[in-house]
């Protein structure tokens, strides 16, 4: 079947009332950005849905795949746009039915948005179903459990007919909910947290704490790859890599061993808080999950949060670990996250970290040294990368160049 349009259904945009135009425009921008590099299509965003007009050479499978990854889209259907006549509808219905397997069942489903169309819903269903039965052998009607469902939408401008409905990612268009800073480690949780807030229309930039030589270049490349996977959904993402060695060593030098984990995370939060204001973000996002590890008890969260007045969003707070793993696999970050390269959260880990840190104690331990200068230096020396869906690390670029030189 050669389709001439893609029908794109909005997710929660129908709930946005007078603000819908803003959301539709943002979604259209996101669609154009996602489809960059492809040709043979025209995007037409309307109030209640979006249509993508396809030329003969358009790669419909690739376009549909990319659309399915965009937040704010509920579903996509390849459709035939036909004239508003029963003859045109009947001809299209026969085209669909010609692809049915022998002895299969079908039904006709009609939605009539144009109430002025001369035939009502039931008349159209009977007429089109009867035409298929007359023209196609060895098929029958089953309105309850049909093998195939020919869907017909009678709209003001034309009639759209389709069978397939491809699920989208749902949620809201990224760019409609403000900007946040994602604390991105190399673990399973934080990429999922980033994906969850993006699903709610939020733009992210990411911050990662790198402690060479204690953390390797492979650990850094792992985080770049996680960012690249997230960027497949939303376009380029800025990744801010913080040189954290100096701060981390000083924490381990002056803070009681049982409190180093708490203090280290407080330093991360102080750095993140400064960056939030620089980039114009409204909140910090992390992958913390209540009660999983010593740093993620309520006592720890209280002690760590105290260094910032910026809202800290924890999308995974109440998830079971298995739920997070399932989501990680669904979004494609799991295999990268489990690569065995240590990040700065796993080095210098005390054998017996305090699970209910006393806030006054951690402040007292940190008071013996003025960390502000080190924090400012870490912020000043941040390395910022813009990660796209086709981003390649320096190592990958060098490898490709060697291959090209060899060939």
UniProtKB/Swiss-Prot annotation:
PROSITE patterns: THUMP (PS51165). ATP binds at residues 183-184, 208-209, 265, 287, 296. It catalyses: [ThiI sulfur-carrier protein]-S-sulfanyl-L-cysteine + a uridine in tRNA + 2 reduced [2Fe-2S]-[ferredoxin] + ATP + H(+) = [ThiI sulfur-carrier protein]-L-cysteine + a 4-thiouridine in tRNA + 2 oxidized [2Fe-2S]-[ferredoxin] + AMP + diphosphate; [ThiS sulfur-carrier protein]-C-terminal Gly-Gly-AMP + S-sulfanyl-L-cysteinyl-[cysteine desulfurase] + AH2 = [ThiS sulfur-carrier protein]-C-terminal-Gly-aminoethanethioate + L-cysteinyl-[cysteine desulfurase] + A + AMP + 2 H(+). The keyword Cytoplasm applies. One of its GO terms (cellular component) is cytosol. One of its GO terms (molecular function) is ATP binding. NCBIfam families: tRNA uracil 4-sulfurtransferase ThiI. This is Probable tRNA sulfurtransferase. It comes from Staphylococcus aureus (strain N315). The lineage of its organism: Bacteria, Bacillati, Bacillota, Bacilli, Bacillales. The gene is thiI.
